[in-house]
Amino acid sequence: MFRSLVRKTTPLLAFGVGIAAFPKDWRKGQFGDKKLLVINDSVLEQIRSTDRYKQLVNDPNLKHYNSSHAFPDQHHKNYVNTGLLFGPDLMEIDPIVFLDEKNGELTSFYHLGDKLISQDGQIHNGIVSTILDEGLCSAGFPLLPSKKGVTASLSIDFKNQAPPQSTVVLHAKVKEAKGRKVVIEGYLETLPLNKSETPLLIAESKCVLVEPKWFKYFAWLQV
């Protein structure tokens, strides 16, 4: 029994010591002032001119930030929206996020360039899936005990394909929050840039977000 206990506890102990041994700056990075990542200034101005954006930016109950500001610098190159797929004709703006942390509601804006298409010439559904996964999780994180979690399941109902050079908006809302489990629903649609346009529904989604029991130790490890 003693040997069995040692085999089970030694890897966990080594993992914890390994993380704790690294400097705090390496583990968390710096969240100071950062330069906004943007390639397409005209798209950014179009978003800011919409009534929806103006309504959100003037709401004192919402946290307003850009996607790249939500995580340490050393992780940028591995993050899809502002790393792997950020560039000319790809993701051309740093996604703009408005988050109601208390009620678990999120609205975020993206621009999808010409190089994000599939063989049919429309935006690849993998891009849509990534936006939905990351966005719905961001809405649910604040309602978890440690504010961290992993996707347990993600279901997506694709309605229409987004054309290239689309500006899209994600709407997400927590439907259930109980202990270490949060259920979020949301949808992605195109953003009308003038009153004569109507939004095109791209996809609807449901995400189950859970916090593993051992995530609570991240708090004192400062990860």
From Swiss-Prot:
Transit peptide, start-end = 1-12
- From which residue to which does the signal peptide run? none
Q: List the subcellular locations.
A: Mitochondrion
Task: Provide the primary localization.
Answer: mitochondrion
Q: Which UniProt keywords apply?
A: Mitochondrion, Transit peptide
Q: Which Pfam families match?
A: 4HBT (PF03061)
Q: Which CDD domains match?
A: PaaI_thioesterase (cd03443)
Entry-linked SUPFAM superfamilies = Thioesterase/thiol ester dehydrase-isomerase
> Which GO CC terms are listed, alphabetically?
mitochondrion
Q: What is this protein called?
A: Uncharacterized protein CAWG_04269, mitochondrial
